[in-house]
């Protein structure tokens, strides 16, 4: 097992990619704390992890609230003895709006959740990873952060910001044994993707080199790799799990 003896915190772990990430980490031996504002889903994910005979509990965590994040991380350290891996998966993606129709309150909310939330969680775990001399922070961005997205001013901006933050953390963390990387999913067959009208799903899938969406497990496998010692000399990278959507396809 790649992650035996490690303790991981996954934010946004109640459903979607965050849930699959948590399960994948547990399958490789990690104990996993599932953090979310939706406790029902977080508890369910945690129960699935416990069924794998791994230590796990769900924790209510609003990543926009610094004190709440700090308290949650302190609880993890107290109850599980360590915090080795952080997967920042909490995010909002629930609206499309061109620049003149973009609501200010949604712009501010997306900045708080997606970008400041990633900052808050990374900062909270940092002292423990620094003290131990080992840590892995994997941040979830998106190809929208590198390519832009029509009608996605707030979302693509926050994801681009996460990439910049990750590179800075990588520079600062390497001397302490803290590796920081960012995963950029493309078109993934997730719950939110399946809500899109079928004709739009088909059009988006055809933009990829594979002409089909990826699966949540494809993203989770990348995260497991980056969390492991197999990636010990990798930091500051932007890993696209995108099926080549950023390539010119025709």
Task: Give residue spans per PLM region.
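Substrate-binding pocket helix/loop in short-chain dehydrogenase/reductase
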Residues: 97-99, 103-111, 193, 204
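Short C-terminal tail/terminal secondary-structure segment
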Residues: 96, 147, 224, 235-250
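Active-site helix of classical SDR
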Residues: 122, 158, 166
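Short, small/polar-rich loop/turn modules that mediate ligand/substrate recognition or access, typified
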Residues: 174, 179, 234-236
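Residue(s) in the substrate-gating loop at a strand-loop-helix junction
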Residues: 142
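Alpha-helical segment proximal to the catalytic Tyr-Lys
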Residues: 127, 171-172, 232
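C-terminal helical subdomain
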Residues: 182, 204-230, 234, 241-243
């Amino acid at each position: 097992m790649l992650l035996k003896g490690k303790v991981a915190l996954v934010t946004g772990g109640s459903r979607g990619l965050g849930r699959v990430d948590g399960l994948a980490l547990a399958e490789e031996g990690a104990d996993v704390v599932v953090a979310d504002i939706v406790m029902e889903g977080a508890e369910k994910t945690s129960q699935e992890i416990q069924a794998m005979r791994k230590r796990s509990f769900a924790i209510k965590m609003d990543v926009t609230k610094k004190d709440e994040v700090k308290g949650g991380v302190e609880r993890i350290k107290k109850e599980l003895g360590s915090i080795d891996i952080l997967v920042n998966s909490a995010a909002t993606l629930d609206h499309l709006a061109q620049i003149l129709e973009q609501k200010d309150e949604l712009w501010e909310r997306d900045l708080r959740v997606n970008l400041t939330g990633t900052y808050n969680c990374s900062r909270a775990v940092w002292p423990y990873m620094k003290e131990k001399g080992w840590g892995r922070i994997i941040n979830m961005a998106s190809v929208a952060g590198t390519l832009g997205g029509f009608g996605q001013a707030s979302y693509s901006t926050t994801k681009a910001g996460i990439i910049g933050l990750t590179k800075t953390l990588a520079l600062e963390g390497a001397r302490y044994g803290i590796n920081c990387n960012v995963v950029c999913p493309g078109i993934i067959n997730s719950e939110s993707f399946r809500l899109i009208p079928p004709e739009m799903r088909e059009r988006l899938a055809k933009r990829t080199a594979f002409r089909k969406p990826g699966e949540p497990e494809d993203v989770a496998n990348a995260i497991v790799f980056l969390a492991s010692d197999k990636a010990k000399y990798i930091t500051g990278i932007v890993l696209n799990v995108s099926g080549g959507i950023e390539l010119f396809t025709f």
